[in-house]
Amino acid sequence: MNQIKMNKSFAEFSKLPKIKQVFTPWFIAALVIFIVGLTIAFTMVGLLNEGFENARALVNDQGQIIGKVADVSGDNHSLMSWLGYDQHANYQELYKTIHDQLINGKTMESLINNTNKNNDPKLYEALHYHAHSKFINHNGTWGFVTKVLSDWENSWFYKYNQLFSQLANSQNPVLAAQGIKSLAKLSTIIQYQNPNYIAYNWVFIVFMMPQMITFIIIVVKLATVFSPKKSAEEKQAYKLAKLEVKNQKKAKKLNNSLQQINLNLEAN
């Protein structure tokens, strides 16, 4: 029995039907990985969708969801905007700026009452950031779900609001109202949190990243197989044309050099 020839030359491979040229073992493996990975990745997005919908949902004055999608360009509040979550804020830095003062024996109320904007702008900014933060649109939904709703106990946004919840017992009605609002924010975050969101997010990342490589393999393979092939005569003509251009450049360069030498001799 003749041994089956496994490795074909390029010429032999090129004579195979296009379908056999495409579906090589490497291509099939890449295609399977691409389909499976993409399916898992988009399944994770589907599981995360609950958090996305909650983040964009219309809420009442108590932060309770009462509708599907809030129009944050008007007077409505989504869950994110009611909480005052700003995707551009560095809540870790804001939290630590205030916390460093509290561990020195100061209170939130004394900090708010005695911090001057000109003397300590960084602390003043941290204490009053919530008052002028840009109410977000829906572009920060992913970060809000994965950073706040998925792991609220370790969320810097949650910890930042915890600091202001200390004002709830203040004798100053304005500060007390601010503290009560912060307590409401904390309970609302806990109400809509889901620890599975962070797992869904990481599974999405793990299975989505390889798709870039497999997609490139698939595209290159298809382009290689279906791109027009040149005949041996065309390839030879192309090589000769390149060689002719190269020789012309050399001749022109040599001619220019000779002319320059002649000019120099005439000048002398």
Curated annotation (Swiss-Prot):
<keyword id="KW-1003">Cell membrane</keyword>
<feature type="transmembrane region" description="Helical">
    <location>
        <begin position="27"/>
        <end position="47"/>
    </location>
</feature>
<keyword id="KW-1133">Transmembrane helix</keyword>
<keyword id="KW-0472">Membrane</keyword>
<feature type="transmembrane region" description="Helical">
    <location>
        <begin position="202"/>
        <end position="222"/>
    </location>
</feature>
<keyword id="KW-0812">Transmembrane</keyword>
<dbReference type="GO" id="GO:0005886">
    <property type="term" value="C:plasma membrane"/>
</dbReference>
<protein>
    <recommendedName>
        <fullName>Uncharacterized protein UU131</fullName>
    </recommendedName>
</protein>
